[in-house]
Amino acid sequence: MSTGFNAQSFLRMVSSSAGVYRMYDVKGDVIYVGKAKDLKKRLSSYFRKNLGNVKTQALVSHIHHIDVTLTHSETDALLLENDYIKQYMPKYNVLLRDDKSYPYIFLSQHEHPRLAYHRGPQREKGYYFGPYPNGGAVRESLHLMQKLFPIRQCDDLYYKSRTRPCLQYQLSRCSAPCVGKVSNAEYDEQVKLASLFLKGKDKQVISELVAKMEEAAGQQAYEQAARFRDQIMALRRVAEQQEVSGNTGDMDVIGVHYASGIACFHLLFIREGKIFGSRSYYPTVPAQTDIEEVLRSFLLQFYLNADIQRTIPKEVVISHHFEELHELEAAVSEALNKKFSIKTNVRADRASFLRLALTNATNAVMTRLSHKNTVEQRFVLLEEILELNAPIQRMECFDISHTMGESTVASCVVFNREGPHKAEYRRYNIEGITPGDDYAAMKQAISRRFDKIDASGKIPDILFIDGGLGQLRIAQQIVDEKFVNLDKAPQLIGVAKGESRKPGLETLIFGDTETSFSLEDDSPALHLIQHIRDESHRFAITGHRNRRQKTRNTSTLESIPGIGPKRRKALLQHLGGLQEVKGASVAELAKVPGISIEMAQTIHDALRG
């Protein structure tokens, strides 16, 4: 493919300074961002006669023009390169898609502080402990905290509405400060101990509790002493279960495995010498990318991504050495304004952690490769059965979900040769049809999916319809209309359930000829079809349930005379949810801002009647 780019003319004008270059294709999209100590030398290497790397050959064949930006130093070039990669997400760069904020445990500054899961901007006043590697680690820690410290985890609205202790008090997981079952001094002491524990100072917590136990026993307050004893025993069990290292302090330990185009970076987050959590990252790696670039690109983006709430330690241990390691250290140190070091040759505890991280990374890649090979085999078999001339690159499946015509939702799920492509999933809220009319729902969904479709759009090779011949005909009619002026159109296949609706008894129907066929119930190709069908059903039904619940919550209250959107919102926010509103007394309802005693009586009668 020739784009008309004159490399010789361009290279004559390029400086030998440090800087960053952006390569564009004929459409004006940035397809690659790189940095260099010597721009002329680096860019000249792309246009040698014999390019050994297949990826580089493909990249060069798509270059339409190149922009360069000079920098004062190679460190500045690294920082700018990272900014450009985040901005343009070029197709030939290794991309780390880590755009989720990290979760924390939040301790509020309320009179009776609460512990809670938090993700996102830290706007509320209080203390944030973390970040944790994932939501599961936070929930597990909160569950543990409930067993160790009787501190509330309910939200403030629920706390305000209590007139008697909740179930957590009966389970000894909360001291019920909402109804005065504990003094402020005792509650504050437990909050202080919980805070110390979350900071990793469990030995200090235990020693303080031992002192309190002995003091209570000396005062013959044996019941209180027994509670302290039980708390000490629970804390000691937790301390024994946690893997503790001598003097390792805070660091990230990264095991890397790269095979057959799949890279896994498995991180162990070591804080206060303990394994605080772990997380695997799978950056998008263009074909034929070498391990050096994968390593450099991942570390560059991971540790220079200012949009991510993450505490970055001073030390990182990684399983592989790479050429630009020291330049990357300098760039991160400058960006963070603190010392930052990357180590590869380590011993003792660090080596033990590194072996663990590397084992996890290797296992993760092997598992993904096994899954990828299985999916690939299923695609190949399906192509053979359908006698297709070209490989299937994209499949979509539509399903409709509703309850007796209520809150109808259509789903569209997408599979590529690696399996589900969840970023491309779509839901359609169906409006303006006769309730329960699945044909009209399918017509609306397919019409919206392919509205204004053109040759450059995302056209599926196969479009599955979860339904019988009637829905398939409607879908085929819409596709014929939308693709009448295009060279390519999807092959439609209906997936009709058998009489007993058991998996393996499905009938498959071609949309264009309406001929039907079946596959053996142990056919891998059928398993692929069942997978995409089941995924579309799951995605549709979860969307329908969410929409139905939202509609019912709204309609239940707004059907009461005098209750509009504002009062409904005030009731739900103040009391904590629809069930709490239904269970509230007239007096409790009247405490809600904007609700008079007469209105409270009306609401109470309507919901109880």
Curated annotation (Swiss-Prot):
The keyword Cytoplasm applies. This is UvrABC system protein C. The keyword Cytoplasm applies. InterPro entries: GIY-YIG_endonuc, GIY-YIG_endonuc_sf, GIY-YIG_UvrC_Cho, Hlx-hairpin-Hlx_DNA-bd_motif, RuvA_2-like, UVR_dom, UVR_dom_sf, UvrABC_protein_C. Interacts with UvrB in an incision complex. It is found in: Cytoplasm. Belongs to the UvrC family. HAMAP family: UvrC. GO terms for biological process: nucleotide-excision repair; SOS response. Pfam families: GIY-YIG (PF01541), HHH_5 (PF14520), UVR (PF02151), UvrC_RNaseH (PF22920), UvrC_RNaseH_dom (PF08459). It comes from Shewanella sp. (strain ANA-3). Transmembrane segments: none annotated. GO terms for molecular function: DNA binding; excinuclease ABC activity. Residues 203-238 form the UVR domain. Keywords: Cytoplasm, DNA damage, DNA excision, DNA repair, Excision nuclease, SOS response. One of its GO terms (cellular component) is excinuclease repair complex. Residues 16-94 form the GIY-YIG domain. The UvrABC repair system catalyzes the recognition and processing of DNA lesions. UvrC both incises the 5' and 3' sides of the lesion. The N-terminal half is responsible for the 3' incision and the C-terminal half is responsible for the 5' incision.
